């Protein structure tokens, strides 16, 4: 629960990707700072080395929550491939107009193109908008290093979908446009939860939606089947939202899209899981799309141009 995690005081542990790890010798690193006229400190040390990620323990003296500490000392975590320090304008520019909850290490950048005026105009023309929550994990920045993409271990991300959103998805079958790969991963994780219900497995029993869990679902189990099963499950328990975690990896390895029909997404860097997702959605056309973007000087990555992919 991110709200509780940010509300702790004094000490906590987080799973982190650590840059310049070789420079971190044994012991702790310390930041000394002033808060409300008093000298304070923040200390951090590696509690456990877990390969790509490390468990880092934080301890601080100031009378503030961990969330307040991050706001006070932290910087906007702009993507490392921008090769610059964060700037004051990033606090508004690197944020969607519809964001509500803290927890992501990156903004869903396809949504940066949407303004209140654009959303209002689209609603006036009959387009419906529904919101989902995905706390984007730091692993989204990790490149796919193995030649065999199937060997790339996916990170875990937590998500939340409201009952009203599931009702809206059922009302417009075949007309779902996901804004960003973040929304795609969230929506496409729902059939895995529904299949657990269908097969009598506790919805949260096995842990996060597994990296390849969706590939094992029978092809004739449709998105509508999944949404109806989830809705019945929620209504039977009086739930107004589903909270879960996912490690879903959408790649051109026979993935079957069940919920999403169209995607609005920026242009992604090579050797990324995001480009694998685009390839799985667009098929071999992804090369033609990216060749066109490159030859016409489209801007790539977070502050770049966007695209609308349709099936």
Name each model-derived stretch.
Residues 1-311:
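Surface-exposed, charge/polar-rich loops and edge strands
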